Amino acid sequence: MEILKHRLVDGGVQHLVCRKNSRKLSGPDMIVVHYTAGTSACTAAEFLAKEEVKASAHLVIGRQGELFQLVPFDTEAWHAGRSCYGGRANLNRYSIGIELDNLGRLQWREGHFVAECGVEVAPVDVYVDDTGELATFWHRYTERQKRLLREICRLLKQHYPIRYVVGPSDITDRKQDPGPELHGFMCK
């Protein structure tokens, strides 16, 4: 896999048309890693590419390693919303947004782990964060997703002056993604 003309090539990446994004980035120096909170990478990518949707991302990474690119890396995507980090606001202007297909935080209901959208998650796919006063439960990322995320971040750092890899929970108090499982990755 490589980056040519601000797009990923090879590696099975599927390029979707997302015409709503046209403002150019001037040297992105940040990667923001999100979770989709949805049921599939394809559904999330197709939704984010719709003209009427006021959100987008550069990439969506599926649980089995599927990869979608919606916006070139030199173009602003609408993923960070109202945000600030390192003394700067409006981070869409400085960042590349990567969405990981993941249901996010889970609830324990009647003996089952359930996502906000109502999908039940098998215990083997649950990440338990017991560092706080009460344990919290999260949809586990797949090894394929984590491996692909690392590879893509490495490529992006080779092509752009990336200084930060953060999650929405680092740039706004409205969000909790990508969750505690990726905390060690985000700090690197």
Regions found by a protein language model. Give the residues of each.
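Basic/polar, cationic surfaces and motifs that engage anionic cell-wall
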Residues: E2-R7, K24-L25, D101-K188
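Peptidoglycan-targeting cell-wall enzymes and recognition modules
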Residues: E51-Y141
